[in-house]
Amino acid sequence: MARKTPIERYRNIGISAHIDAGKTTTTERILYYTGVNHKIGEVHDGAATMDWMAQEQERGITITSAATTCFWKGMDLNFPEHRFNIIDTPGHVDFTIEVERSMRVLDGACMVYCAVGGVQPQSETVWRQATKYKVPRLAFVNKMDRSGANFYKVVDQMKMRLKANPVPIVLPIGAEEGFKGVVDLIKMKAIIWDEASQGMKFEYQDIPAELQGDAETWREQMVEAAAEANEDLMNEYLENGDLSEEKIKLGLRTRTIACEIQPMLCGTAFKNKGVQRMLDAVIEFLPSPVDIPPVAGVDDNEKEVTRKADDKEKFAALAFKLMTDPFVGQLTFVRVYSGVLNSGETVLNSVKNKKERIGRILQMHANEREEIKEVLAGDIAACVGLKEVTTGETLCDPSAPIILERMVFPDPVIHVAVEPKTKGDQEKMGIALGRLAAEDPSFRVRTDEESGQTIISGMGELHLEIIVDRMKREFNVEANVGAPQVAYREAIRKAVEQEGKFVKQSGGRGQYGHVWIKLEPNETGKGYEFVDAIKGGVVPREYIPAVDKGLQETLPNGVLAGFPVVDVKVTLFDGSYHDVDSNENAFKMAASMAFKDAMRKANPILLEPMMAVVVETPEDYMGNVMGDLSGRRGIVQGMDDLPGGMKEIKAEVPLAEMFGYATQLRSLTQGRATYSMEFKHYSEAPKSVAEAVISNRK
């Protein structure tokens, strides 16, 4: 089937922002202007098209990144039709993983900032993720109609806080109540949108006299930024003192795709102004799948291979999201990097080396769907019928295996025990949790061996609350939830050498394993490392993997309180064996015994997760908030002034002290402060805390 849209006219973009910067509203407007939505859905009354899980509508925050397709020809209808795949990303810090997984499959992103709040803590996290995956981006300053709106302040904050290089291509005309439209610095015209047509109609006017000077100054900066794209443009600029519209766009596009600059726009999505110009900027400055380097991966011989964004290449795609749908069961969202996928075809899951048949292929418009027969290179779609695939795995042509770069998911930092309210729901709860864990790799489920309880783990209290809520809504299982538990770890402070001997010789075939190991602290974050330093075959080669395995099986249960052991290096340097009685199991046992004994002598310590906490509070309550953080063993690391008499406090606080913080903060500040927190690192717990934790586990 011929392409309806050439691949050069595809744009796979994410819309990303801090909570309440107006991201979902912005997406809604995009769907409206691109002709998909007839009535605009407002988040205020819980009707936004993109926020499609019932919970999102109640809480007014976006949790799952729904992928939506729409078309755009430019607000002047001056472009050939382009196809946008928009991935909506959540802004809440407990869902950072969702942002990460969408960044992995995007070609470009629109960063939405609030004209009043500016660059907020979560914006910094999202920016870091976009930088990590080298995603070109635009910035859109939203809510220009709100009191306290200041476009230029956000430009400065982007430079200071994000170390970004924003290049405004429009300037606001007026602000707050007086916000009318924008000055287009490329055309040097004012764009005024018509309110009666909900922004569908607009007109170009002359730039208001009072803005002419500013417009010329900012235009010069923009043209200079464009000219730096290459020597030809720079020479032309130096000769003529200006560049043509086309050359400006070419220069800005080149540098945006190289992640050197970020074109910056502004508007108010709620009042239907400015989003239309941003859509044009997506076409002008963000890359199509062929403008970015071919995707890299490894083949079945671990050799690096690349795939170009071309229908003629062999098929390769990344499964970036799983969702359970009430009508069709499990949906697997895929980004196709190369080749073509047809419904009914068999594909290879190269990570698990399993073949699967694709049932139907759907393209989503938020939660409405259209069935399609094939999905082409550069496109995003949802597949039905894949049983074994989990997030981050590669699907490819069985004749040309490739494994694309995997996504790295963080380990959970908080656990709670859950049990169904009625015994009969035990099995149903197991199925529900299994489904939810397949959808979200930062959520884990396990059964505690000692107590038999079901333990769920996640990235924060809100994360787990939402999981429990979804069990009730989607699977009809009500659960009782225990008190949250912290994921402590154990480590060591000094290096020791230790012998381990496992000998059983009582008639018949015996057991004999004997090792000497050196246990020492490893660099933070390095995890477990095994070094084989055996000389002269004192431990035969075939038993060395058994020693490694014996050590690894001992790691989950430390000697202090049974928490997992991290950041240790173990060197096997000596030992002995018996011709008849030695076997793998004996060496596994010997290694395990040596490790436990060594651990006791190596000054074991307890590590606790530390959270980066950012509180925004009115100045009047600052003393209370800081006192409370200190009482939670928090270390305040910095303070900033925010607009409107607000203060921002950055602190590092142990997770163990943060339970129930939301409620406490509300009562300390009469509900006027907000906070966000994300996992930072593990650090040694003070002696008194460690002793209390250890005695509770005994």
Curated annotation (Swiss-Prot):
UniProt entry tagged with the keyword Cytoplasm: yes
Disulfide bond positions: none
Locations listed in the record: Cytoplasm
GO cellular component: cytoplasm
Keywords: Cytoplasm, Elongation factor, GTP-binding, Nucleotide-binding, Protein biosynthesis
Binding residues for GTP: 17-24, 88-92, 142-145
MF terms in GO: GTP binding; GTPase activity; guanosine tetraphosphate binding; translation elongation factor activity
Superkingdom per UniProt: Bacteria
Principal location class: cytoplasm
Role according to the record: Catalyzes the GTP-dependent ribosomal translocation step during translation elongation. During this step, the ribosome changes from the pre-translocational (PRE) to the post-translocational (POST) state as the newly formed A-site-bound peptidyl-tRNA and P-site-bound deacylated tRNA move to the P and E sites, respectively. Catalyzes the coordinated movement of the two tRNA molecules, the mRNA and conformational changes in the ribosome.
Family per similarity comment: Belongs to the TRAFAC class translation factor GTPase superfamily. Classic translation factor GTPase family. EF-G/EF-2 subfamily.
Protein name as it appears in the record: Elongation factor G
